[in-house]
């Protein structure tokens, strides 16, 4: 049973099952799940039919596994939690069986000309506002809830290095 997977080695239970990733280029729907599967000794060739599916989106992964088209799939944790909360019928026949270790994922970017357009210090102020959102304040909580987040943290380019290395190992980045 998949619901008893307690560590990465347990992912071997996915061998010979019909498995789908989300989008082929998704960090949380393909890249990181495939990396951890590989770490457990599971490669795409080990799935039923010696291939994996690609649903195209996290919501589609839920729908395809729920319909029985696939036995299991990988998707973004926030999408899963959002469906549990807001659309429980979609997930009522499904079970979460494993969560990848944490990694830096989404990031915020701004156009380089914001200082010219909105004045000196604008980018610094924008960054400060985003990083100081406080879930205890109702208006801030509404914003954070849209991202299913408790807060945002400062990240640096070097924190994405492992994702880049994984992308190269899986031939998704050349």
Q: Which residues make up each language-model segment?
A:
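Second-shell loop/turn segments in exported
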Residues: 18-27, 51-52, 66-70, 112-116, ...
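Short helix-initiation/N-cap motifs at beta->coil->alpha
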Residues: 44-63, 102-104
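A ligand-binding cleft/hinge motif common to bilobed small-molecule-binding domains
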Residues: 38-39, 64-67, 71-92
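Periplasmic-binding protein-like
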Residues: 46, 88-130, 144-162, 166
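Tryptophan-rich aromatic "cage" segments
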Residues: 164-174
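Solvent-exposed loop/turn segments at secondary-structure junctions
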Residues: 24-28, 59-60, 78-81, 102, ...
């Amino acid at each position: 049973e998949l619901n008893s997977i307690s560590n990465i080695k347990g992912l071997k239970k996915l061998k010979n099952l019909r498995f789908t990733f989300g989008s082929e280029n998704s960090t949380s729907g393909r890249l990181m799940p495939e990396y951890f599967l590989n770490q457990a000794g599971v490669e795409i060739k080990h799935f039923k039919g010696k291939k994996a599916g690609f649903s195209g989106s996290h919501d589609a992964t839920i729908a395809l596994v729920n319909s029985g088209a696939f036995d299991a799939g990988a998707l973004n944790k926030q999408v899963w939690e959002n469906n549990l909360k807001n659309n429980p019928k979609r997930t009522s026949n499904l079970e979460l069986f494993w969560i990848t270790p944490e990694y830096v994922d989404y990031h915020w970017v701004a156009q380089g000309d914001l200082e010219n357009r909105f004045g000196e210090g604008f980018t610094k102020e924008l960054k400060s506002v985003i990083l100081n959102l406080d879930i205890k304040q109702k208006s801030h909580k509404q914003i954070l809830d849209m991202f299913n987040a408790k807060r945002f943290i400062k990240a640096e380019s070097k924190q994405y290095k492992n994702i880049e290395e994984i992308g190269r190992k899986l031939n998704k980045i050349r």
